[in-house]
């Protein structure tokens, strides 16, 4: 390829990938599959490596993470990043309104209200449309240069739609679903978990290695324009519209209000809606919308007079810790869980809360009988925040983690660089039981009627010890179990038999190979197509697949380099369990008669087995149309986890709703 052709192709790929990033991370309306995005990205990386003279700082390829830094350089903000004054109740808001009106001689004032994202405040500097520097807020005057880490956040444009010089400010955050996934991975690996999404975002942004930040799935909302050359902005709402036109991601839930009563109504509305968002908010920001009035009101040394932050009441309650229970996960990690006197937190009754590991119990000096403060991290996971030491009577009991596994009495170990205690006995009954529960779960073999209770019964009756044992179960054995009759036993035997026909990716995920989630299992299944081919794959062959890292590749090779595993696979073959990939690839979907042909579909929430971009591509290949909002013309809503407000819209317009399982069934017909 000539240099001229290479340069042209590099420019084409950059434009294409920038468009894909904008559609996915800003508009939330992806137009291509993950696989197609990855192919284009790998082609760009290869061409840039072969033609380094064409490398650019605003290339989409820099989002994968660059060189490890030694330190973060200090940055002085051109204008201070001021904090906001706080309001904690309706009276505080009315006082703010009174002060504003007094300051502008009771001129009519319009407010703009925005959700207060609970993340990390940052500034973004652009020169002639190119992202040149990003910094933390720091103390408001001096922050830290985190440019390379911010480049990994795909919601931040590396090049704007206009060649304008400006400084934008916003909040980098971690979505709740990403927070839960990250902590699950850290717990499985025996690492310290993050207390909440804000800490996770801040910890990710301040990594000296940008590649770590790149893996954390951060996002960002821009909320303000600090400096802009050669453009007159008359209102804050106008500045947000302008930022959106430039390619920034702004929060869609803002509202202009003509009176303080409308502001209070907005605050009350979002206090109710808050749990349904996929990101944390800790309040509402209220600003005078008119820029001229802002300038007239001015600022104090610490904060602007024209803005205030209403802080939501803390979602924290006090209850008594009555005991500590231990559980052994399928990877052997021993996790302590607090048993609590039942208490309502964020709308649900909480009886248990994770204590994560022994170090946390010691650090917080948690004892049995203590009164503790409990909250939901990310409005999702109950956790013990701290002990109320003033309530201690002296009768509380110190807790010490055991030295041996509570399930099998094997000695517990703490692996290198792990904080968790782990049972490494491969015959530990608790690990086997948890592994069986995972094997039959929805995203794995999806055996209807075979949940945790039934697995426990089968295990305690000594009917099953391995995954393959499930396929030797008889109706007569099931009839010996509590709550099983003729019909339920027959149905379960049939469901187990039907699971033999599952596609390879479900079996792979069900095996519980360390570090291999549902998405990676699908990637392996599509790539190798048969279990035999995957078993023979080398670490180098696995690492050559997009998004498969060294740790996962090593884990897969180690797993299949085990005689017990190979014997298990042989048993699967003898029982007739399918071990080939049955899913359709996008290229195979053209001209197939499909339910989706001519239908308008909305995807919402997190899809576990395939990404929304891949789902969109497959629907379109089958003749359907995917849109970003629900209306009367919508035929179907496919709802994953944390689906949010689109479910309510579907109900309002009487639109059919499918879960991911139903969607996959139709897709694979």
UniProtKB/Swiss-Prot annotation:
Q: Which InterPro entries match?
A: BRCT_dom (IPR001357), BRCT_dom_sf (IPR036420), DisA/LigA_HHH (IPR041663), DNA_ligase (IPR001679), DNA_ligase_AS (IPR018239), DNA_ligase_CS (IPR033136), DNAligase_adenylation (IPR013839), DNAligase_N (IPR013840)
Q: Which residues bind Zn(2+)?
A: 405, 408, 423, 428
Q: What is this protein called?
A: DNA ligase
Q: Which GO terms describe its molecular function?
A: DNA binding; DNA ligase (NAD+) activity; metal ion binding
Q: What class of enzyme is it?
A: ligase
Record keywords: DNA damage, DNA repair, DNA replication, Ligase, Magnesium, Manganese, Metal-binding, NAD, Zinc
Task: Provide the function of this protein.
Answer: DNA ligase that catalyzes the formation of phosphodiester linkages between 5'-phosphoryl and 3'-hydroxyl groups in double-stranded DNA using NAD as a coenzyme and as the energy source for the reaction. It is essential for DNA replication and repair of damaged DNA.
Report residues binding NAD(+).
Answer: 34-38, 83-84, 114, 137, 171, 287, 311
Q: Name one GO biological process term.
A: DNA repair
User: What does it catalyze?
Assistant: NAD(+) + (deoxyribonucleotide)n-3'-hydroxyl + 5'-phospho-(deoxyribonucleotide)m = (deoxyribonucleotide)n+m + AMP + beta-nicotinamide D-nucleotide
SUPFAM superfamilies membership: BRCT domain, DNA ligase/mRNA capping enzyme, catalytic domain, Nucleic acid-binding proteins, RuvA domain 2-like
Q: What's an example GO cellular component term for this entry? A: cytosol
Instruction: Please give the family membership noted in the entry.
Output: Belongs to the NAD-dependent DNA ligase family. LigA subfamily.
Task: Reply yes or no: does the keyword DNA repair apply.
Answer: yes
Cofactor(s) named in the record? Mg(2+); Mn(2+)
Question: Native species of this protein?
Answer: Bacillus cereus (strain ATCC 10987 / NRS 248)
Q: What is its EC number?
A: 6.5.1.2
What are the residue boundaries of the BRCT domain, all occurrences included?
Answer: 591-669
Provide the active-site residues from the annotation: 116
């Amino acid at each position: 390829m000539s240099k001229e052709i290479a340069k042209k192709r590099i420019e084409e790929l950059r434009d294409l990938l920038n468009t894909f990033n904008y559609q996915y991370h800003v508009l939330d309306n992806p137009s291509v599959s993950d696989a197609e995005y990855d192919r284009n990205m790998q082609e760009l990386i290869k061409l840039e490596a072969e033609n380094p003279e064409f490398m650019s700082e605003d290339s989409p390829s820099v989002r994968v993470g660059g060189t490890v830094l030694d330190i973060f350089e200090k940055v002085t903000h051109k204008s201070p990043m001021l904090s906001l004054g706080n309001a904690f109740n309706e009276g505080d808001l009315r006082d703010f309104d009174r002060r504003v009106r007094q300051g502008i001689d009771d001129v009519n004032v319009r407010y703009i209200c925005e959700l207060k994202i609970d993340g990390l405040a940052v500034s973004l500097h652009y020169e002639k449309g190119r992202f040149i520097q990003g910094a933390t807020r720091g103390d408001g005057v001096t922050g830290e240069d985190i440019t390379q880490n911010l480049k990994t956040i795909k919601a931040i444009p590396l090049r704007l739609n206009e060649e304008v010089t400006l400084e934008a400010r916003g909040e980098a955050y971690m979505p709740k679903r990403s927070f839960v996934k990250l902590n699950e991975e850290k717990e499985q690996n025996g690492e310290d978990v993050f207390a909440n999404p804000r800490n996770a975002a801040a910890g990710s942004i301040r990594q000296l290695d940008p590649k770590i930040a790149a893996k954390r799935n951060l996002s960002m909302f821009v909320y303000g324009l600090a400096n802009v050359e050669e453009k007159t902005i008359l209102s804050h709402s106008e500045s947000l519209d302008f930022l959106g036109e430039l390619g920034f991601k702004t929060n869609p839930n803002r509202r202009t209000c003509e009176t303080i009563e409308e502001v209070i109504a907005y605050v009350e509305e979002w206090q109710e809606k808050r749990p349904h968002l996929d990101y944390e908010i800790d309040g509402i920001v209220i600003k005078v919308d008119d820029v001229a009035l802002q300038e007239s009101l001015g600022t104090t040394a610490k904060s602007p007079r024209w803005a205030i932050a209403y802080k939501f009441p803390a979602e924290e309650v006090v209850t008594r810790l009555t005991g500590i229970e231990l559980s052994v996960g399928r990877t052997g990690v021993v996790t302590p869980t607090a048993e609590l006197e039942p208490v309502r937190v964020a709308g649900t009754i909480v009886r248990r809360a994770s204590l994560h590991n022994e170090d946390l119990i010691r650090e917080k000096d948690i004892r049995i009988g203590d009164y503790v403060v409990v909250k939901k991290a990310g409005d999702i996971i109950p956790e013990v925040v701290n002990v109320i030491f003033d309530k201690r009577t002296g009768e509380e009991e110190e807790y010490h983690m055991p030295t041996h596994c509570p399930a099998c009495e094997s000695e517990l170990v703490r692996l290198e660089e792990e904080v968790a205690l782990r049972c490494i006995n491969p015959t530990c009954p608790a690990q086997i039981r948890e592994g069986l529960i995972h094997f039959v779960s929805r995203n794995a073999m999806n055996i209807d009627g075979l949940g945790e209770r039934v697995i426990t019964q089968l295990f305690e009756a000594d009917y099953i010890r391995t995954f393959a044992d499930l396929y030797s179960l008889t109706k007569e054995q099931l009839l010996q179990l509590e709550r099983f009759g003729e019909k339920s036993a027959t149905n379960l035997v049939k469901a187990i038999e039907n699971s033999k026909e599952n596609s390879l990716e479900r079996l792979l995920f069900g095996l519980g190979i360390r570090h291999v989630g549902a998405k990676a299992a699908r990637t392996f299944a599509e790539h190798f197509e048969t279990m035999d081919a995957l078993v023979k794959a080398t670490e180098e062959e696995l690492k050559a697949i997009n998004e498969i890292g060294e740790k996962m590749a090593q884990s897969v090779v180690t797993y299949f380099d085990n005689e017990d595993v190979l014997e298990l696979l042989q048993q699967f073959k003898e029982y007739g369990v399918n071990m080939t990939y049955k899913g359709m690839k996008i290229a195979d979907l053209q001209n197939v008669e499909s339910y989706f042909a001519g239908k308008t579909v909305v995807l919402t929430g997190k899809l576990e087995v395939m990404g929304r971009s891949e789902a969109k591509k497959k629907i379109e290949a089958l003749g359907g149309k995917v849109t970003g909002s629900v209306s009367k013309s919508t035929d179907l809503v496919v709802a994953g986890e944390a689906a949010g407000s689109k479910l309510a819209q579907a109900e309002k317009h009487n639109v059919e709703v499918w879960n991911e399982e139903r969607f996959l069934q139709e897709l694979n017909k």
